[in-house]
């Protein structure tokens, strides 16, 4: 659960340089984007900005990981994995919206929400699952501003929900 250093990435023009090559190197295949669960859209493309609605830890078969994070519930390492899966779902929505992840200039901001027990305090370590993935996929362009906060509940009792704002190449 350690952070990812941007120094771990190949120089421009080398193998594993595109987001898709990095995904393949990580053994990640993007699933179909999850459908909205209520009256909203999964993304809004406005000018050179892409706004992504909150996504959760949905497996490709539709299974949603649920539960409270913290003592007596879901552990930090497992919740980190759920945040990473949520990041994969965000990438899937980005791909659907843009047609090509190479259009991403920068991941600007994440809002990570953790369904936590009242005394849980390690929200940042959970949301690192998504942050680390975005840096692995986009390199330095994946570094972002972020909030990681705890909530008393989330839709469907999911463990995490994460939304994103992304800047695009002109």
Segments (PLM) and residue ranges:
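Short, polar/acidic, helix-capping and beta-turn segments at strand->helix junctions
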Residues: 2-170
